Amino acid sequence: MRATAAYVGMLRLGRMCAGSPGVLGARAALSRSWQEARLQAVRFLSSREVDRMVPLPVGGLSYVQGCTKNHLLSKTVGRCLEATAQRVPEREALVDLHENIRLTFAQLKEEVDKAASGLLSIGLCKGDRLGMWGPNSYAWVLIQLATAQAGIILVSVNPAYQATELEYVLKKVGCKALVFPKQFKTQQYYNILKQICPEVENAQPGALKSQRLPDLTTVISVDAPLPGTLLLDEVLAAGSTQQHLEQLQHIQQFLSCHDPINIQFTSGTTGSPKGATLSHYNIVNNSSILGERLKLHEKTPEQLRMILPSPLYHCLGSVGGTMMCLMYGATLILASPVFNGKKALEAISRERGSFLYGTPTMFVDILNQPDFSSYDISTMRGGVIAGSPAPPELIRAIINKINMKDLVVAYGTTENSPVTFANFPEDTVEQKAESVGRIMPHTEARIMNMEAGMLAELNTPGELCIRGYCVMLGYWGEPQKTGEAVDQDKWYRTGDIATMNEQGFCKIVGRSKDMIIRGGENIYPAELEDFFHTHPKVQEVQVVGVKDDRMGEEICACIRLKDGEETTAEEMKAFCKGKISHFKIPRYIVFVTNYPLTTSGKIQKFKLREQMERHLNL
């Protein structure tokens, strides 16, 4: 057996340690001889050994590369759906309990073809952007797959967005079409759109001309006839003609797996959302690799029934949920339009669910249901918990009380399609409770000591960086911000502070920026601070995250009023309603007269956070 220097990226690591200015900078160059010596002490392994083993860090340094035993897939989403529909045509593909819809893979493929053909028939073309704005539903899954089938780029729009937030994302990517339900609960989608696009009421369907949204020409209503809109059923009917189905088949011949397929918005430190753009290649392979980590290929059809309470506009829901089910012929079960702990338990019991996806907050709510013990959860086997840090006691409760012995703790970012680290199902409870698992196949990770400018020692905190097939194409229309996030050697800087141990387990210990993760939602203080500064009584405001047993973190706005002004926390919360998403409204509003400062006058947010937690008795 020929020896090789392929041991988990050793040659790449050697080049990194050589001090390329584009990678580690000048300080790394000074450490070249030291790091090379560390590498020389590592035994070379054969290619077969590399593929058979669990990847380990190299040379006592925080660098690891996932195995490459299985080839990456060069398929579009449409080709994957076609393959699964041919392989298991009569297996249940989708169950929407709220709408009482059930489809087999053959039926889903037929509906997706009609929807994709229909979108082309109303004038949308390959590369056009279409926004999907609404809660979890059959229509969401249909549009997700239909846009991919037609080469149209899906823009995932947060269903809680208000008018200004909606306007920003639609203009940012030049959305040509927007799909939404008339309303859900108190969210009046059509009325919100009219605030920024009043022309829709008098427009001919498909021929909208908007002053503030010049790219938007087509508005599609999912469930009700509305002025200026097309009904989704009308789009499907238009796509049923042989002419348009043939047009779809023609277009599919020219789709590439490297074409963009999805834009997901993720906020930046300035508070302005950035459109992370993902390709078929990103999404197909991430869902395939995650399913492999979950060992879905070993499951029987009865064990392939996934309950998905996670939102589809999030990457975990659309990739780890919809796409992974599609890749492995698993049944996707939508328990409710938005998360509801009771509905999730009802879905598990009624549908004989075996896998469950969710954030820590969702699992806390499920476990805290007063009638939890009355549900039959005997069919549960495993699932994924991700989105924000989960305390060890919660991991143990999920495994023991929800019967999820094969639970996997996963970590990722939207920019990485999303999952880059995850446990193996057979990992111990302690390993799952104390880490986010080990590196995924075809993915590299390194932890950088930012002060020294080189790779961190094992068990030493530093910034986590990722490289591989999973890294996004870029931020839509923002090459400068893309360059700040992804360096010339294709390393993506996550902004998360992490450690790696000798076994390759990664632990997220903090964030290099002040992002708040509330129940799986990423919230950036700068965005809220800018918003509160529009209040006439506010002189200054600082927003921090404070600990919360249920949500992980809650938002605390520390407000300094202008001289002579008075107000209340209730007034401030009322000021937020209808202007920012409900999940961004601070739970705590504290009025202060000053902030903790450094000697140079900079606000010390970590000290402010500590002060607020003491003040609030958290």
Swiss-Prot record:
<dbReference type="GO" id="GO:0031956">
    <property type="term" value="F:medium-chain fatty acid-CoA ligase activity"/>
</dbReference>
<keyword id="KW-0067">ATP-binding</keyword>
<feature type="transit peptide" description="Mitochondrion">
    <location>
        <begin position="1"/>
        <end position="44"/>
    </location>
</feature>
<feature type="modified residue" description="N6-succinyllysine; alternate">
    <location>
        <position position="547"/>
    </location>
</feature>
<keyword id="KW-0496">Mitochondrion</keyword>
<keyword id="KW-0547">Nucleotide-binding</keyword>
<dbReference type="GO" id="GO:0005524">
    <property type="term" value="F:ATP binding"/>
</dbReference>
<feature type="modified residue" description="N6-acetyllysine; alternate">
    <location>
        <position position="185"/>
    </location>
</feature>
<feature type="modified residue" description="N6-acetyllysine">
    <location>
        <position position="182"/>
    </location>
</feature>
<feature type="modified residue" description="N6-acetyllysine; alternate">
    <location>
        <position position="573"/>
    </location>
</feature>
<keyword id="KW-0809">Transit peptide</keyword>
<dbReference type="InterPro" id="IPR020845">
    <property type="entry name" value="AMP-binding_CS"/>
</dbReference>
<feature type="modified residue" description="N6-succinyllysine; alternate">
    <location>
        <position position="185"/>
    </location>
</feature>
<feature type="modified residue" description="N6-acetyllysine; alternate">
    <location>
        <position position="547"/>
    </location>
</feature>
<feature type="binding site">
    <location>
        <position position="511"/>
    </location>
    <ligand>
        <name>ATP</name>
    </ligand>
</feature>
<keyword id="KW-0276">Fatty acid metabolism</keyword>
<dbReference type="Pfam" id="PF13193">
    <property type="entry name" value="AMP-binding_C"/>
</dbReference>
<keyword id="KW-0007">Acetylation</keyword>
<dbReference type="InterPro" id="IPR042099">
    <property type="entry name" value="ANL_N_sf"/>
</dbReference>
<feature type="binding site">
    <location>
        <begin position="266"/>
        <end position="274"/>
    </location>
    <ligand>
        <name>ATP</name>
    </ligand>
</feature>
<feature type="modified residue" description="N6-succinyllysine">
    <location>
        <position position="481"/>
    </location>
</feature>
<keyword id="KW-0436">Ligase</keyword>
<feature type="binding site">
    <location>
        <position position="602"/>
    </location>
    <ligand>
        <name>ATP</name>
    </ligand>
</feature>
<dbReference type="InterPro" id="IPR045851">
    <property type="entry name" value="AMP-bd_C_sf"/>
</dbReference>
<feature type="modified residue" description="N6-succinyllysine; alternate">
    <location>
        <position position="573"/>
    </location>
</feature>
<dbReference type="GO" id="GO:0006631">
    <property type="term" value="P:fatty acid metabolic process"/>
</dbReference>
<feature type="modified residue" description="N6-succinyllysine">
    <location>
        <position position="602"/>
    </location>
</feature>
<feature type="modified residue" description="N6-acetyllysine">
    <location>
        <position position="343"/>
    </location>
</feature>
<feature type="modified residue" description="N6-acetyllysine">
    <location>
        <position position="513"/>
    </location>
</feature>
<protein>
    <recommendedName>
        <fullName>Medium-chain acyl-CoA ligase ACSF2, mitochondrial</fullName>
        <ecNumber>6.2.1.2</ecNumber>
    </recommendedName>
</protein>
<keyword id="KW-0443">Lipid metabolism</keyword>
<dbReference type="InterPro" id="IPR025110">
    <property type="entry name" value="AMP-bd_C"/>
</dbReference>
<dbReference type="InterPro" id="IPR000873">
    <property type="entry name" value="AMP-dep_synth/lig_dom"/>
</dbReference>
<comment type="function">
    <text>Acyl-CoA synthases catalyze the initial reaction in fatty acid metabolism, by forming a thioester with CoA. Has some preference toward medium-chain substrates. Plays a role in adipocyte differentiation.</text>
</comment>
<comment type="similarity">
    <text>Belongs to the ATP-dependent AMP-binding enzyme family.</text>
</comment>
<feature type="modified residue" description="N6-acetyllysine">
    <location>
        <position position="401"/>
    </location>
</feature>
<dbReference type="GO" id="GO:0005739">
    <property type="term" value="C:mitochondrion"/>
</dbReference>
<dbReference type="Pfam" id="PF00501">
    <property type="entry name" value="AMP-binding"/>
</dbReference>
<feature type="binding site">
    <location>
        <position position="496"/>
    </location>
    <ligand>
        <name>ATP</name>
    </ligand>
</feature>
